């Protein structure tokens, strides 16, 4: 027994193994190890004033994401897939820009692991998309995916998942269409709708029913703002969306989209 305990302590004290980042950028595919990225000629030590995931200032060794996206243009669409099934849909343009907000791929050093995101939770590593000056370009929390395993170039959400589209007869400036854009930015990374989407974390938001059908309006708003105030369990992962992230008019538009899609179930 004593030998088993000693072995367990030894294993727990060993550094994390090097991770692999997979890039699938159309005709170009590439794998980067964490060691290669930490030694990348453009790697820098950066400071994040208010980290979205850790809720405090953080310091990282990071590479400008744009230098890794060989062959990607501003009109392309990318998806960052996390180890837990989170799938962030992102237009490429903000990821390629060098300011005012700039995207960085933070790389966890296996010899100096980052802190856990919470009790019983892993860290944000091995790879984490962070931003300097995010407020300058309106970068939202869902654009900070962590535990990234793969970044890939795909067709747009509209082209891949027509079941998500609102009625084409709606005017271009309708609240429902604006709500669809907000759904893509804030919800699609965790939820599918009408079975459409790549996320594997949260429930489908229209099949078999829309939350607009089984929640009273005030409770649905409360769920979106502060999920833990309505229901709690140890594995809960849904974040709350404060007004600084999703304004009241934007929440109205998001709910307008969900109500509209309740009538467009397959």
Identify the role of each PLM range.
Residues 19-155, 266:
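Structured, non-membrane catalytic/scaffold regions adjacent to prosthetic-group chemistry
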Residues 1-4:
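Positively charged n-region of N-terminal signal peptides that target proteins for export
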Residues 49-56, 168-169, 208-210:
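Second-shell loop/turn segments in exported
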Residues 155-182:
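Electrostatic cytochrome c docking/interface patches
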Residues 179-194, 220, 238, 254-258:
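The canonical Cys-X-X-Cys-His
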Residues 200-206, 226-255, 261, 265-266:
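Axial heme c-ligation environment in periplasmic c-type cytochrome domains
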Residues 13-15:
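N-terminal signal peptide c-region/cleavage motif recognized by signal peptidases
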Residues 192-225:
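Gly/Gly-Pro-rich "capping" loops immediately C-terminal to redox-active cysteine motifs
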């Amino acid at each position: 027994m004593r030998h088993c305990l000693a072995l367990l302590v030894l294993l727990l004290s060993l550094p994390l193994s090097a991770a692999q980042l997979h890039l699938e950028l159309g005709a170009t595919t590439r794998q980067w190890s964490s060691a290669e990225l930490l030694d990348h000629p453009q790697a820098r030590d950066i400071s994040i004033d208010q980290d979205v995931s850790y809720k405090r200032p953080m310091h990282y060794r990071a590479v400008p994401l744009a230098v890794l996206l060989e062959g990607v243009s501003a009109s392309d669409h990318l998806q960052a897939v996390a180890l837990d099934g989170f799938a962030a849909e992102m237009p490429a343009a903000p990821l390629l820009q060098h300011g005012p907000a700039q995207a960085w791929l933070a790389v966890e050093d296996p010899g100096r692991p980052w802190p856990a995101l919470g009790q019983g939770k892993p860290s944000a590593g091995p790879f984490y998309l962070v931003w300097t000056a995010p407020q300058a370009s309106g970068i939202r929390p869902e654009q900070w995916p962590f535990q990234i395993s793969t970044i890939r170039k795909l067709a747009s959400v509209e082209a891949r998942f027509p079941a998500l589209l609102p009625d084409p007869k709606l005017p271009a400036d309708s609240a429902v269409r604006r709500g669809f854009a907000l759904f893509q930015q804030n919800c699609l990374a965790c939820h599918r709708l009408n079975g459409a989407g790549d996320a594997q974390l949260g429930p489908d938001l229209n099949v078999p029913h829309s939350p607009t059908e089984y929640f009273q309006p005030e409770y649905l708003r409360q769920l979106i703002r502060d999920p833990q105030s309505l229901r709690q369990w140890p594995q809960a992962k849904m974040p709350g969306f404060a007004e600084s992230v999703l304004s009241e008019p934007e929440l109205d538009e998001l709910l307008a989209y969900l109500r509209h899609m309740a009538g467009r179930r397959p």
